[in-house]
Amino acid sequence: TFLFSNSLTHVTSQLKTAERHLPALHMYEDTWGSGTCIGDSLNEFVKQYSHAYLTRNTVVLIMSDGLDTSEAGQMKEALQEIKKKTSLLLWLNPLLGTPGYQPERTRIKEALPFIDIFAEAHRLDSYVQVSREINKQR
């Protein structure tokens, strides 16, 4: 499990022992809300971790508003690699439930061709709908 904001952070061990380590995740909180380097973080993941974590059976879930502050093309490059190596790429975006939001007007548009399921994530029933979509695709 990885978190990213301005950089990528591997948090699998903290989540496995959540009772002891979950409070440690708060140390990353100061980078939240200060812009998201999605492309840079995903490229870092591809270079450092994809060989160990990505297979044709892997489902990748990204939860982000897609408001990327990386250079144009970075997110597309990384998602293209991730998509080649995995079975399903999901992107849950809390902005999709916002009236007037148009993903094609943001940098997320370069990611759309590589995403199998692009869904809203602003209400509990959004997650129920996503689970149905996953079952259809698997």
Tell what function each PLM region has.
Residues 1-3, 60-62, 91:
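Structural beta-sheet core signal
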Residues 2, 15-16, 73-80, 138:
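C-terminal structured domains
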Residues 9, 21-58, 100-102:
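Von Willebrand factor
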Residues 57-70, 116:
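DG-centered beta-turn motif at the end of beta-strands
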Residues 70-73, 129-130:
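Extracytoplasmic/secreted cell-surface and envelope-processing proteins
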